[in-house]
Amino acid sequence: MATSWGSILQDEKQLEELAKQAIDRALAEGVLLRSAQHPSSSDVVTYAPFTLFPSPVPSALLEQAYAVQMDFNILVDAVSQNPAFLEQTLSSTIKKDDYTARLFDIYKQVLKEGIAQTVFLGLNRSDYMFQCGADGSKALKQIEINTISASFGGLASRTPAVHRHVLNVLNKTKEASKILSNNPSKGLALGIAKAWELYGSANAVVLLIAQEKERNIFDQRAVENELLDRKIHVIRGRFEDVSERGSLDQNRRLFMDDQEVAVVYFRDGYMPSQYNSQNWEARLMLERSRAAKCPDIAIQLAGTKKVQQELSRVGLLEALLPGQPEAVARLRATFAGLYSLDMGEEGDQAIAEALAAPSHFVLKPQREGGGNNLYGEEMVQALEQLKDSEERASYILMEKIEPEPFRNCLLRPGSPAQVVQCISELGIFGVYVRQGTTLVMNKHVGHLLRTKAVEHADGGVAAGVAVLDNPYPV
């Protein structure tokens, strides 16, 4: 996938000057992170790592990813409303994965008590890579769907101007015009605003559940600012704040001090390390409340790796989406090979195949946040330890996607510009809002491209491996 600026990657002096201009433009545009040394303060900030140039993405696959996003929104919504499917699918996982089990316990408790909320909000991001066939053909294959704390919609809204600037500096104005406009933060805020409106209390606020040490605060502020522009106030709080200042009234309306909360937006709570006993109690209070949760715990469970694997089984999509054969076909076309590791013949066979050809598989736990997957020799060692243990049910196996590498220049604070062979991962942001049984909003709202050096098997921007990027349609 050649581009017209490939030769510049070999000109060290020109690259150095371009990198300076790109970094200054990124800072001016607000492509920012708090510093690693001061993650609780905005007194010292730096630019978020990014590519010097946009990266080539096949136009047809970009269009396909956008076209299927509303189907994925509907699928997540359908799964979240199907307690029998969730219980059956996660039954083996929750026996050996304490984190998923705690989430599921809260889910069951709220179901038993009766769900108070009537407005349901999904802000999802479906992530893909581009499988390269032996004949050079490219195919869109889903890596995962993120249903909680899908990040970088704010910073992704600011990077197109940076790459247009770089190409304009090179007098490549035609190429600069091909950089797609992109504003996920606006679309995410529209979903939150619709849920807030349907909640029906003009004085209620949005509660953003955040970490105390948050380097990626400007990404979150982008959504907050969009809401404030719509006269919707956002308050930030940690789980600890909910425990200390939160309460439910007799109608299960949620209050922080004396402020009623219409929507709870989680930018924390997606990893086991983010919970202690106090935080679990806070999560239960939030789930029991009438406030719209983004996500509620059913939507979070719908985004687990085990659910993703089960959805690939023959007939499952048809059962969950009856009478929608076109949507089923679009969804299934994006599925990579996914394999259960539950105890039994099917799991035994999957492990045997992975041990025989480890370069073709990835071992995935039920975790979000990046950097959790196992590849190659690490995967082999883990499977050898797990193969006779019921603990293997807390993992799934996935076919390893093999994209076509390309060259780009990675820019990171405190490091020299790095010209390397790269691969990219494309994310599409989706928003849906349901009131009762009526879907009142379902749309795609933008994209995120993250790029990393080929030698890194796993890890995103927050994990320090990937960098922000923009698709250059080819």
From Swiss-Prot:
Q: Where does ATP bind?
A: 144, 305, 364-373, 375, 398-401, 425, 452, 458
Residues recorded as binding substrate, renumbered to this chain, are 125, 148-151, 214-216, 220, 267-270, 450, 461-462
Could you tell me the superkingdom of the organism this chain comes from?
A: Eukaryota
List cofactor names only: Mg(2+)
* Known pathway: Sulfur metabolism; glutathione biosynthesis; glutathione from L-cysteine and L-glutamate: step 2/2
Q: Which UniProt keywords apply?
A: Acetylation, ATP-binding, Glutathione biosynthesis, Ligase, Magnesium, Metal-binding, Nucleotide-binding, Phosphoprotein
Which top class of enzyme applies to this chain? Answer: ligase
Q: Which residues form the signal peptide?
A: none
Note how many cofactor molecules are bound and how. Binds 1 Mg(2+) ion per subunit.
Mark the residues carrying the PTM Phosphoserine.
S415
Q: Which CDD domains match?
A: eu-GS
Q: Which InterPro entries match?
A: Glutathione_synthase, Glutathione_synthase_a-hlx, Glutathione_synthase_C_euk, Glutathione_synthase_N_euk, GSH-S_sub-bd_sf, GSH_synth_subst-bd, PreATP-grasp_dom_sf
Q: Specify one Pfam family.
A: GSH_synthase
This enzyme's EC code(s): 6.3.2.3
Positions of modified residues (N-acetylalanine): A2
Q: Which GO terms describe its molecular function?
A: ATP binding; glutathione binding; glutathione synthase activity; magnesium ion binding; protein homodimerization activity
| Residues that bind Mg(2+) | E144, N146, E368
Can you cite a GO biological process for this protein? response to cadmium ion
Q: Which reaction does it catalyse?
A: gamma-L-glutamyl-L-cysteine + glycine + ATP = glutathione + ADP + phosphate + H(+); gamma-L-glutamyl-(2S)-2-aminobutanoate + glycine + ATP = ophthalmate + ADP + phosphate + H(+)
**Entry's PANTHER family?**
GLUTATHIONE SYNTHETASE
Family as reported in the entry's similarity comment:
Belongs to the eukaryotic GSH synthase family.
Annotated function: Catalyzes the production of glutathione from gamma-glutamylcysteine and glycine in an ATP-dependent manner. Glutathione (gamma-glutamylcysteinylglycine, GSH) is the most abundant intracellular thiol in living aerobic cells and is required for numerous processes including the protection of cells against oxidative damage, amino acid transport, the detoxification of foreign compounds, the maintenance of protein sulfhydryl groups in a reduced state and acts as a cofactor for a number of enzymes. Participates in ophthalmate biosynthesis in hepatocytes.
What binding partners and quaternary form does the record give?
Answer: Homodimer.
Task: State what protein this is by name.
Answer: Glutathione synthetase
What organism is recorded for this protein? Mus musculus
